């Protein structure tokens, strides 16, 4: 466990999933700067994209209500974990997506998301539903701030001014303007490889083209059995391909991004009736019993928010091994340099290469009988 000191108060914070001995912190310099310099008045605060609940824990006190919105299922788990660790009982309403509230917040605190389209979409919603002039504070590490961020904030906020940098982090102050970006909430494009229309919410990768890793795995799916899991489904391209290749299959599509699962649901409904698939918002496969799947397809992430890590991939591999029937297969794609073959060999006892490109490798392991 690690400790963050804010105004003489010490918070105990953990990342999620928790990995004992992991040196990575559950907060960064932008979180600490926001908690000490946000300058928002007393009253209800709306918090967006708080990775592990550090902002919520730091702003919590009995007289304040917090509205907390995060697309990430793991962020919700991290928040619950850290509220409990710090014995915080502040009134707090949690949702995966922005929704109308009976009261208006006195201010909005936004942790800069990895996808700038998500920030634009969030500011559009806030400008549409909350009063003009509501204070907004955006917190980010300088290395995470793209060159297009100043233009975006000036277009959608009034009175925009950045703070001085502290420990390589910065705050951007502004006020809701009532203006809109003109960006569609859901974008759609025709995927030639699947011959179907794909729709995407802003926080989903592959908004106008196939993810390169998914493209390689699509070309090397192999035989599709009856019970398939698409682990980390994203927009659902692997699920769609599985259903197209075996009309009798049933696909369980899982992702920790709420917007990914909503995108996947829309896309699957275009190709099959609901009895052939189920889409779940969750962390890996922790919610299902073992020995149910014939095949797990996986294109695992190698980052959590802005941090490079293989912890999530390892969790996915362990869950895949647990839920596969004896003789069931895990087929996955990953960057060659990540060395996933060693992890699969350790877990399954073997691993074989199905295909490789200069950047990606498709690997398969079979659960022993």
UniProtKB/Swiss-Prot annotation:
Pfam hit, one: MTS
Enzyme Commission number, as recorded: 2.1.1.174
Main location: cytoplasm
GO MF annotations in UniProt: 23S rRNA (guanine(1835)-N(2))-methyltransferase activity; nucleic acid binding
Similarity comment text for this entry: Belongs to the methyltransferase superfamily. RlmG family.
PANTHER family the record matches: RIBOSOMAL RNA LARGE SUBUNIT METHYLTRANSFERASE G, RIBOSOMAL RNA SMALL SUBUNIT METHYLTRANSFERASE C
Protein name: Ribosomal RNA large subunit methyltransferase G
């Amino acid at each position: 466990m690690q400790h963050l000191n804010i105004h003489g108060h010490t918070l105990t914070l953990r990342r999620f999933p928790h990995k004992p001995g992991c040196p990575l912190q559950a907060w960064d310099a932008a979180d600490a700067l926001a908690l000490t310099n946000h300058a928002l008045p007393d009253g209800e605060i709306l918090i967006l994209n708080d990775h592990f609940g550090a902002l919520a824990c730091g702003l919590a006190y009995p007289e304040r209500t917090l509205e907390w919105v995060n697309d990430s299922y793991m962020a919700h788990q991290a928040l619950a974990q850290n509220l409990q660790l710090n014995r915080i009982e502040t009134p707090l309403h949690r949702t995966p997506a922005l929704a109308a509230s009976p009261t208006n917040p006195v201010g909005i605190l936004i942790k800069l998301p990895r996808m700038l389209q998500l920030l634009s979409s969030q500011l559009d919603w806030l400008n549409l539903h909350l009063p003009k002039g509501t204070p907004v504070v955006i917190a980010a590490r300088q290395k995470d701030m793209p060159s297009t961020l100043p233009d975006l904030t000036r277009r959608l906020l009034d009175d925009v001014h950045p703070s001085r940098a502290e420990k390589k982090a910065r705050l951007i102050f502004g006020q809701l303007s009532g203006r809109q970006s003109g960006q569609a909430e859901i974008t759609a494009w025709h995927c030639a490889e699947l011959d179907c229309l794909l729709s995407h919410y802003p926080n989903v990768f592959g908004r106008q083209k196939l993810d390169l890793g998914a493209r390689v795995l699509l070309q090397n799916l192999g035989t599709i059995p009856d019970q398939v899991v698409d682990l980390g489904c994203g927009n659902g391209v692997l699920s769609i391909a599985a259903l197209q290749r075996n009309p009798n299959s049933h696909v369980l599509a899982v992702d920790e991004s709420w917007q990914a699962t909503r995108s996947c649901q829309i896309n699957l409904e275009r190709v099959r009736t609901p009895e052939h698939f189920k889409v779940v918002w969750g962390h890996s496969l922790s919610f299902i019993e073992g020995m149910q799947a014939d095949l797990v397809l996986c294109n695992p992430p190698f980052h959590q928010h802005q941090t490079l890590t293989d912890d999530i991939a390892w969790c996915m591999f362990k869950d895949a091994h647990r839920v596969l029937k004896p003789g069931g297969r895990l087929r996955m794609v990953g960057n060659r340099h990540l060395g996933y073959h060693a992890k699969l060999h350790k877990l399954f006892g073997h691993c074989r290469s199905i295909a490789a490109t200069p950047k990606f490798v498709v690997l398969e392991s079979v659960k022993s009988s």
